[in-house]
Every structure is written in C-alpha cells, then in structure tokens.
C-alpha cells in the first residue's frame, strides 16, 4: 500500500518541500520501495523521484531544495512494474504539465493504455497509474476544463484508487477515492490531503475523511467535494478533530497493527481478486502448467505452508498429483523434469523457500511463485509470478497476507474448476461480514484461552490447515502451547492428555461435520472444554461455538482464528505486533 501526501499553500517556499519530506518519513511504516515528489512553482511543474529509501532519495535528488506552492509526495509499494526510478510516482502526461500519484489497482489499465497509445500518447513506465495523467491530458485536449477532465478520467477507471492530480499553473489538488483511504487536513493558509493522518498531524488536527466514490479538489483555503452523481457535499458537518499522537495515528485508531491488518483483510482480498481478474491471461497460463505437470510440489514456511497445504489438498482431490513441502525440509524432495513447484512466501525472501526452488529448478522443475513483494528474490527466480495485493504488513504474525494467499489460491482453483468467478467477487464482503459478526465472541474465547497452558486445535480435510494456522497464531503471539492434529489422529496419542477443562478448538468447515462430531464427543467424554468454529453446519454439545454461514468457508475461518489469538495475546498483556524471538522475514537457514 502506497503512502500519499499533498500540500497546497498560499505561499511559495522551500518549507513545503521540508514538510513533504517529513510527511513521507511518517508514512514509511507502510513499507515502500521508491519515492517521488512533484512541485508547482512560478517556474512550472517539477518531478524528482527514484528507487530507494526516503532519506536516500531526498539526498540524491535534493528534494528539500525544491520550491513551490503545491507539492505531491509518494512512497510506492510496487504492484504493476518492478521497483525502478521510472516506475516511481508521480507520473506525468506527454507534455509534463500534469502529475499524478495513486494508491490502488486500475483493473482496465491495459485497455486504457492501448486506446491512449492509439491516440498518440507516449508512456514512460510499466505502471497502471500512468494512464491517469494521459486521460486527463486527452480530455483537456477535447476542450474540458481541468476539473471536468479529471472527473472524466476518474469515470474511465475500473478498480480501486486514491488519486491526487496537479496541473501546472493550478493552485489546487484534485482528488478521488474508491476503496483506498484519503483524508484531508485543514490548515491555516494551507490544506493537506493524504493516505494517512500521520502525514499531516504535526500541522493540523482538523480532518475530513473522504468517502468512497467522492471526488473534488482542495485549494489553500477551501475544499470542494462532490458525490458520484455530481451533487455538491456540505463538508462542515463532516469536519472533526483528532487527539492522536503519531504512533496512534499510524494505526488509524487501532491499538495494534495486527488488529488493524485483520480489519484491512477485506480490502486486501478485493485488491488481490481485482488484480487476478485483470491478469487472467497469467492465471490461465498457470492453470495450463498445473494441468500438464506430472507433480505439483507446493512449498512454503510457517503460515505460507498452511496455505500451501490447503492448495495441495484441493489439487489432489481434483486428481492432480501434489506434494506439500515444509520449506526447511526441501532437501528431502527429489524433484525432476516435469515437476511444477508452487512456492508461497509473504516476503518473497524466505531463505528455505529460495534454496528449495533453486534446488528443484536445477533438477528441471518449473517454478510458480505467490508472493506479496514484487520482484522479490523468489519472484525473480520464478517462471511465473503471481502477486498478492495485501500491501505492507507491519505485524510479525501473518494476518491479511494469509487471507490473501488463500484468496489467490481459491481464485486459481475456481479457474481450474471452470467455476463462475462471481463467487470470488463476493470474497471481500464475506471476510468483512465475518469480522463484524465474530469480534465479540472471539474476544471472549481469546480471554478464556489466555488462561490455559495447553490447547488442541483439531480439523479434518480442508479445515486441517486452518486448525494448524490457528494453533500457530496463538502460539506465536500469546505464548500458549498449542498443537494441531487431524481430528481422527487425536485418539492415537493426543487424547491421553485430555482431562477436565482441557481446551480443544475444533475447526469445522461444514464438509466433514459428522466425523468431527464423533471426535468432539470423544474429547467431551474426557472432560474437555470444546470451542467450535463451524461454517454452514452446527456442531452439537460444544461449550462455545462460533456459527457462520459462508459461500467460501476458508475465508470466514481465517479471520476468526486470527482474532482469537489476538485477544488471547492482549489479555495476557503481550504486544501482538512484536512477538519475542520471531522475525517478519526469515533469511537464514
């Protein structure tokens, strides 16, 4: 997820450059790979940008020496096109009179780009964003005034966006929002607009939150806002003040990044699905490789292994020979030509996964990767690269990245099975509705489990990987010893530890309810306290049950197990964002 800042002032000065740089530094927590700034002064529009960290780019490009009365700043998290100087934002039109920064995914950018190129427009980057300044330019050529041209450009876009645009000679910043955050900060003689409140918090605490499908512009002293039907919105009743410090603001009011990122999962899933829809040709090539492979080896570590296990089970059920591999055990696998390796890694840098795919490539296997970081090491060494669109994840324990891994896998499976993709379009709402429904009960369960020393998580079939992930999560951040087992294996040893009050969490995706019910009764007979997470089919005699209805059970279960672990951790007074002894990316074997 990119960081965006815009400032428009009555006065032209270098101070705005310093303020822009300061704002970009406060947005660094989002994660990024490149930085860029645009300014408008009496000398015209100027762009300075490069790949690298804020401090590096500021020094290299002498950004703090820029002058102007309008500034745009952007930190880019690469999605379309690798992290390079030319792919960094802001992007401009053919004549360098219009500059745009953008966060989100433009689903129809390929069609728009082809149309604009046929009209003579020249592109300089590989990004989806660059179509926006060219669209504005094209509409202005047709006689529209700047705001009308901006509105027409926005109407041409399909997908998600937070867009800021400036035009040389204009003392205003145009903006539009859909599915990505934009907030206006109201100052004295200057106004701000940003993706996050921390960007402008030192300068004003008066804010106006832009809602989906709203657009408008800010000047140094005014805000103009319209809804999607062109109705002018009275902003006075929506202005409010915040009493936050910088750290609190970066969490957008949430007490921890982990809970914030769980709540970001619906948007992350939407952007992931939208991206896969727009790149359906890639998905179909991946499907052909899967169909033609003698064996599909699915490799991942930790949470990514659990997502991979889910995928492997589904492939085997479809008659496609698949082997799930824990990445750190890659050396046990004897791969050969004809094998296809599906590598899953949030960071794209996990050393065990990287070493595994290198070994298997050397034996003739093809590599497909699913990562959250464009042009990461694993992606670079893959024949086909699929990217999640979760955005940066600050919390060490994977939450929204696990959910987007599952969403990506489910999308691939839907295409493989030739299912109607309309169901996948519902995925963001399914995740959102689940979170809204279960937050209270997951808190209660988390508070109870926080008092326990040992927990079993049981599942069968496709719910087993979710049970494994649930046990890992509560182990990682609440420091409660938890073990996951196939429920049918519980009587082959684990049940010997069950006594009165022993907590057992049963994950039931609705597929094998009767068998799970038998396992529940076996545990119950020995005094276990049963917590059930059930989708579409209720279990009998559970002590506490979360009941869900869902077209995509796995996407409903994922946030439930994350929330339970989160509330267990905070009940014990632990920081769930920074669990002891763990790192976000493991780069040593």
From Swiss-Prot:
Enzyme Commission number: 2.6.1.16
Chief localisation class: cytoplasm
MF term (GO), any: glutamine-fructose-6-phosphate transaminase (isomerizing) activity
Active site per UniProt: 2 (nucleophile), 584 (for fru-6p isomerization activity)
Compartment list: Cytoplasm
InterPro entries: GATase_2_dom, GFAT, GFAT_N, GlmS/AgaS_SIS, GlmS/FrlB_SIS, Ntn_hydrolases_N, SIS_dom, SIS_dom_sf
UniProt xrefs under Pfam families: GATase_6, SIS
Catalytic activity: D-fructose 6-phosphate + L-glutamine = D-glucosamine 6-phosphate + L-glutamate
Entry's Gene Ontology cellular component terms: cytoplasm
Domain Glutamine amidotransferase type-2 span(s) in chain numbering: 2-221
All residue ranges annotated as the SIS domain in the record: 286-426, 445-579
GO biological process: carbohydrate metabolic process; fructose 6-phosphate metabolic process; protein N-linked glycosylation; UDP-N-acetylglucosamine metabolic process
Keywords linked to the UniProt accession: Aminotransferase, Cytoplasm, Glutamine amidotransferase, Repeat, Transferase
General function of this protein: Catalyzes the first step in hexosamine metabolism, converting fructose-6P into glucosamine-6P using glutamine as a nitrogen source.
Subunit organization: Homodimer.
Name by which UniProt lists this protein: Glutamine--fructose-6-phosphate aminotransferase [isomerizing]
Organism annotation: Sulfurisphaera tokodaii (strain DSM 16993 / JCM 10545 / NBRC 100140 / 7)
């Amino acid at each position: 997820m990119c960081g965006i800042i815009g400032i428009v002032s009555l006065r032209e000065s270098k101070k705005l450059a310093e303020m822009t740089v300061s704002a970009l530094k406060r947005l660094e927590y989002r994660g990024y790979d490149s930085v860029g700034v645009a300014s408008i002064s009496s000398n015209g529009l100027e762009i300075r940008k490069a790949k690298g960290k804020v401090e590096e780019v500021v020094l290299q490009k002498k950004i703090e020496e820029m002058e102007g009365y309008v500034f745009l700043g952007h930190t880019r998290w690469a999605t379309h096109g690798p992290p390079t100087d030319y792919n960094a934002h802001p992007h401009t039109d053919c004549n360098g009179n219009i500059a745009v920064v953008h966060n989100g995914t433009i689903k129809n950018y390929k069609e728009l780009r082809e149309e604009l190129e046929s009209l003579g427009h020249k592109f300089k980057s590989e990004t989806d964003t660059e179509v926006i300044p060219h669209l504005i330019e094209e509409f202005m050529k047709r006689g529209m005034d700047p705001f009308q041209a901006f509105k027409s450009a926005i109407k041409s876009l399909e997908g998600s966006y937070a867009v800021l645009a400036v035009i040389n000679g204009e003392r205003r910043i145009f903006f539009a929002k859909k599915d990505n955050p934009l907030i206006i900060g109201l100052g004295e003689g200057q106004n701000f607009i940003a993706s996050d409140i921390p960007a402008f918090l030192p300068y004003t605490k008066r804010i106006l939150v832009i809602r989906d499908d709203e657009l408008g512009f800010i000047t140094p002293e005014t805000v103009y806002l319209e809804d999607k039907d062109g109705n002018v919105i009275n902003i006075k009743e929506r202005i409010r003040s915040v009493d936050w410090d910088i750290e609190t603001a970066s969490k957008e009011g949430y007490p921890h990044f982990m809970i914030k990122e769980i709540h970001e999962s619906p948007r992350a899933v939407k952007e992931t699905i939208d991206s896969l829809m727009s790149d359906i040709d890639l998905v179909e090539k991946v499907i052909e490789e899967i169909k033609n492979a003698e064996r599909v080896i699915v490799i991942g570590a930790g949470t990514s292994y659990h997502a991979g296990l889910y995928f492997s089970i589904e492939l085997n059920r479809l008659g496609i020979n698949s082997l799930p591999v824990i990445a750190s055990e890659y050396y046990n696998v004897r791969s050969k030509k004809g094998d296809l390796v599906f590598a899953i890694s949030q960071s794209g840098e996990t050393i065990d996964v990287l070493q595994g795919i290198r070994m298997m490539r050397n034996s003739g296997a093809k590599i497909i990767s699913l990562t959250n970081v464009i042009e990461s090491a694993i992606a670079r060494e893959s024949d086909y690269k699929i990217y999640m669109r979760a955005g940066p994840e600050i919390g060490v324990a994977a939450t929204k990245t696990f959910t987007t891994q599952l969403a990506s896998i489910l999308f691939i499976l839907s295409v493989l099975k030739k299912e109607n993709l309309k169901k996948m379009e519902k995925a963001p709402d399914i995740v959102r509705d689940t979170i809204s429904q279960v937050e209270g009960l997951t808190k209660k369960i988390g508070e109870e489990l926080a008092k326990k020393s040992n927990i079993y998580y049981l599942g069968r079939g496709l719910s087993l990987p979710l049970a494994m992930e649930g046990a890992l999560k509560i182990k990682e951040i609440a420091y409660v010893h938890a073990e996951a087992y196939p429920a049918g294996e519980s009587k082959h040893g684990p049940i010997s530890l069950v006594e009165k009050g022993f907590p057992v969490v049963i994950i039931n995706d609705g597929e094998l309810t009767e068998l799970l019910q038998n396992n529940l009764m076996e545990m119950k007979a020995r005094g276990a306290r049963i917590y059930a997470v059930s989708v579409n089919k209720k279990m009998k005699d559970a002590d506490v049950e979360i009941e869900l209805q869902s077209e995509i059970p796995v996407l409903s279960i994922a946030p439930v197990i994350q929330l339970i672990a989160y509330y267990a951790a905070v009940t014990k007074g632990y920081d769930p964002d920074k669990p002891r002894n763990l790192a976000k990316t493991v780069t040593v074997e």
